[in-house]
Design a protein with these regions (language model features):
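A position-specific signal in ABC ATPase nucleotide-binding domains
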Residues: 15-17, 64
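Helix-to-loop junction immediately C-terminal to a conserved catalytic motif
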Residues: 12
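Conserved ABC transporter NBD signature motif
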Residues: 20-29
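ABC ATPase nucleotide-binding domains
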Residues: 39-41, 49-206
Length: 206
């Protein structure tokens, strides 16, 4: 891979950056903070839901770890169930859920902790095309309404163009270009970005 997931893990605190590398949250250097101190939410491609817990318990897990009292946990979980329209799934186990339902539970669990930043690692890859398109719109609308900063890793160009306010194109562990979707599409800085993002007319010249 080009390093997308590794970069996400560094931001989360699961891996350390190379010497000199820093992770900054809103002007605060969090490079030395442990993951539990960074207050990040994470949604993985595999969802990483706990099979021994029901939906309600999965959503409340991060709150329990943060030692919120029972009423706060119940209130926040209820809020998430309503927000994600999965109230009727509260007591189902994970193996009783469809792919789309698991995705909603994983997102609810990540948002429940009110993270400073939400990290999503190709969360829609395992879903069929129709469901993927629908959830893409739902996630975009939800995160914008909540005002949550999100970093969304994807290899799908159309997904990046549809969701991103700013896009980072990576190749071989390095950043090839950073910019708005429009800027990257119309003004690619090199051949790799042009090839990756859109259809191009390439003309050789002297």
């Amino acid at each position: 891979g080009c390093g997308k997931t590794t970069l996400l893990r560094i931001i989360a605190g699961l891996e350390e950056p190379d010497d000199g590398g820093q992770v900054i949250f809103n002007k605060e250097n969090v490079t030395k903070l442990l993951i539990e101190k960074r207050n990040v939410g994470m949604v993985f491609q595999s969802y990483a839901l706990f099979p021994n817990m029901n939906v309600k318990e999965n959503i409340g897990y991060g709150l329990k770890v943060r030692k919120l009292d029972t009423k706060q946990i119940d209130d926040r979980v209820s809020e998430m169930l309503n927000m994600m329209s999965i109230n009727d799934l509260s007591f189902r186990t994970i193996d009783q859920l469809s792919g789309g339902q698991r995705q909603r539970v994983a997102l609810a669990r990540a948002i429940a902790v009110r993270p400073r930043v939400l990290l999503l690692d190709e969360p829609l890859t395992a879903l069929d095309a129709i469901l993927r398109d629908r959830l893409r719109v739902e996630i975009d609308s939800l995160l914008r309404s909540l005002g949550i900063t999100a970093i969304y890793v994807t290899h799908d160009q159309s997904e990046a163009m549809a969701l991103g306010d700013r896009i980072v194109v990576m190749s071989d562990g390095k950043i090839s270009q950073i910019g708005t979707p429009r800027n990257i599409y119309f003004h690619p800085e090199n051949e790799f970005v042009a090839d990756f993002i859109g259809t191009i007319n390439r003309i050789s010249g002297n």
